[in-house]
């Protein structure tokens, strides 16, 4: 028995499923999850002493690479003054000012402690601002585990094999309308039917929870136009894409301005941080200046602010995001070439510092339906073959891959060579 196997057995006796977030349990690929003991740069190390080139990156936050010395020092300096105050600090102001600088659509921003809190709060705010109840989301897009958003969600829900979650009252879920991602005609049809009942559209501008699926040309522009026409709030869930697809997020990458933006992952530099922000007229509906209540004991925690601010400062280095996208492109091209050589049908997508690959005959995957129809059994085998090669991919066919600034030429070459050997064994 490996040390990871022993730890997993112990964990299951005290933690539901042995994990504190479902996708970590390896249900999507089978086998025993890796128990990580440390991480450095582009690598993670498990309890059995194995080293892996890491493309999970703590599910997105570690864009500068693991254990970055400058971020670590910023945390150390902040800890010297205390862990949490439950009171305003200058660090919160500096973080808010930095977010506004990098994401111009955000005029005011509220800090929270997770991406789920960010999306949940943004939905409540949109409903309060518009006085409407219904929201529109897309099949396969995951926006955290708030009740109204776990309807035809992607990622963990797909990995579990269920489109929804028990425990959500039907009377509550009925206010969530769902249409196909990348299908503007369905959006227009639902708005024509419900008109002034829809408070907002919430969308991942690049879907990262049915693997990586970018928007088709005109889709995001169309959502902007529909929201303008019906006076609904357009919410970009950039928890995954924020500061990763581009310095200004997917909205900068695709040049579309939402009304509200949800942030998480990268913004915390590895600490638990989320945020939502947008137009002043909407954000001023939040308490204490407005009637929509939102609060959090650890919101704006000084340690988290220090880590996040330093991460955003490092990300502002000229050329860094071009390097990230070049890495994503190289991985995708290498995987496609290796699969073709082995006679295996595979296609890829990428946007900035995130990528995805699909075992399918389709030329491109652009929808949730296509993602669910890919060869999931082949993905499982490939995942374990890559693990044996020392490459740690996301343990689910419905999760995007993440590159980081520490993935250099050697790591890319080693990853592509490992993939070629794995494809040959499939």
Curated annotation (Swiss-Prot):
Its EC number is 5.4.3.8. Belongs to the class-III pyridoxal-phosphate-dependent aminotransferase family. HemL subfamily. GO terms for cellular component: cytoplasm. InterPro entries: 4pyrrol_synth_GluAld_NH2Trfase, Aminotrans_3, Aminotrans_3_PPA_site, PyrdxlP-dep_Trfase, PyrdxlP-dep_Trfase_major, PyrdxlP-dep_Trfase_small. Its main location: cytoplasm. It is found in: Cytoplasm. Homodimer. The modification N6-(pyridoxal phosphate)lysine is found at residue 265. PANTHER family: GLUTAMATE-1-SEMIALDEHYDE 2,1-AMINOMUTASE, GLUTAMATE-1-SEMIALDEHYDE 2,1-AMINOMUTASE 1, CHLOROPLASTIC-RELATED. Pathway: Porphyrin-containing compound metabolism; protoporphyrin-IX biosynthesis; 5-aminolevulinate from L-glutamyl-tRNA(Glu): step 2/2. GO terms for biological process: protoporphyrinogen IX biosynthetic process. It catalyses: (S)-4-amino-5-oxopentanoate = 5-aminolevulinate. This is Glutamate-1-semialdehyde 2,1-aminomutase. GO terms for molecular function: glutamate-1-semialdehyde 2,1-aminomutase activity; pyridoxal phosphate binding; transaminase activity. Its cofactor is pyridoxal 5'-phosphate. It comes from Pseudoalteromonas translucida (strain TAC 125). The keyword Membrane does not apply.
